[in-house]
């Protein structure tokens, strides 16, 4: 059964958000989705790069207003 996760990282600053995202995704199955909420400006750069290098798919990012929202899918 697929589960979708919401990860609230508001108030955390680099490098904590990426470390928590990586640990969370490691415990997920392929094709599961995770919604990430963050107010750290560094995530606008870090999360797309993380997805690229770790081969996950960034389905959506909303970064015009805080909290920023990112929807990721594990795997490609």
Swiss-Prot record:
The UniProt entry lists the main location of this chain as cytoplasm
- Which residues are named in the active-site annotation? 14 (cysteine persulfide intermediate)
This protein's GO CC annotations: cytoplasm
A molecular function annotated in GO for this UniProt entry is: sulfur carrier activity
InterPro entries, alphabetically? Sulphur_carrier_TusA, TusA-like, TusA-like_sf
Pfam name, any one:
TusA
Pathway(s) served: tRNA modification
Cellular localisation: Cytoplasm
Query: Which keywords belong to this entry?
Result: Cytoplasm, tRNA processing
Which top-level group of life is the source organism from?
Bacteria
**Which GO biological-process labels does this protein carry?**
tRNA wobble position uridine thiolation
How this chain assembles, per its entry, is: Interacts with IscS.
Function (record text): Sulfur carrier protein involved in sulfur trafficking in the cell. Part of a sulfur-relay system required for 2-thiolation during synthesis of 2-thiouridine of the modified wobble base 5-methylaminomethyl-2-thiouridine (mnm(5)s(2)U) in tRNA. Interacts with IscS and stimulates its cysteine desulfurase activity. Accepts an activated sulfur from IscS, which is then transferred to TusD, and thus determines the direction of sulfur flow from IscS to 2-thiouridine formation. Also appears to be involved in sulfur transfer for the biosynthesis of molybdopterin.
Q: Which family does it belong to?
A: Belongs to the sulfur carrier protein TusA family.
Any idea what this protein is called?
A: Sulfur carrier protein TusA
Species assigned in the record: Buchnera aphidicola subsp. Acyrthosiphon pisum (strain Tuc7)
Organism taxonomic ancestry: Bacteria, Pseudomonadati, Pseudomonadota, Gammaproteobacteria, Enterobacterales
């Amino acid at each position: 059964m697929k589960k979708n996760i919401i990860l609230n990282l508001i108030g955390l600053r680099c490098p904590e958000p990426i470390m928590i995202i990586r640990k969370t995704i490691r415990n997920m199955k392929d094709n599961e989705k995770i919604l990430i909420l963050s107010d750290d400006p560094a995530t606008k750069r870090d999360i797309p790069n993380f997805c690229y290098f770790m081969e996950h798919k960034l389905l959506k990012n909303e970064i015009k207003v805080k909290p920023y929202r990112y929807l990721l899918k594990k795997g490609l």
